[in-house]
Amino acid sequence: MDNKWFELGANEQPLDIIKETCGFAGIFKQIGVIGDSLASGEFESHDENGSIVYTDMYEYSWPAVLERITGTKYNNYSRGGMTAREYMQSWADANGFWKWNQAYIIALGNNDSFVCGHPLGSVKDVNAECPRDNADTFFGNMGKIVCKLKTIEPNARIFVVTPQLRGEACDKDIRYIASELAKLCDMFDFTYLLDMTAH
């Protein structure tokens, strides 16, 4: 076997080499994606009155593109404007989205504080042993989501994606979210951070 596939350069970063086949992204057979407009392929358009309309266009979303490239089945549980609170408290149950997947990608956080004004809290709001005790904060609800997914598939690989930097005043909060999400990932087996603030 040629081990060159597995070797990383001394200073190589994840986005240094982008493969047309998505590299090892096809290692999973089925992935669930929990996210907001950045995962739902949301488009902005104008109606006949000139008002802005937002429409989720799942067939154009990055999970749909990865599905076509890799052959992996992507179940997209996202919606524009989604927050960790809404996903946990109503959206997933109302739509039957608590389903088995081999892996999950959770990409929330853009709307929670910056749009809806939900308190961020901290990883101290997460009780992994008794998630119903989690505080009603972004981190408390993220902890509940991960706990629920782990009850569905204890060995699921969960990838938590941080919000991306915007070059705005909110970047300080985004860096805080990333640092706390790293701690959240450390609380659970097979749970990994995809830190968009680092690339």
Model-based region annotation:
Residues 1-58, 67-68, 97-100, 151-154:
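N-terminal secretory targeting modules
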Residues 30, 41-140:
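Conserved SGNH/GDSL esterase-like catalytic core that processes O-acyl groups on lipids
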Residues 34-36, 77-82, 107-110, 161-165, ...:
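Active-site-proximal beta-strand/loop segments in catalytic clefts of secreted hydrolases
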Residues 66-67, 149, 182-186:
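A generic structural signal for well-ordered alpha-helical segments
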Residues 142-146, 178:
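Generic structural signal for well-ordered alpha-helices
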Residues 145-156, 163:
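Catalytic cores of nucleophile-dependent amide-cleaving enzymes
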Residues 159-198:
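Substrate-gating cap/lid alpha-helix
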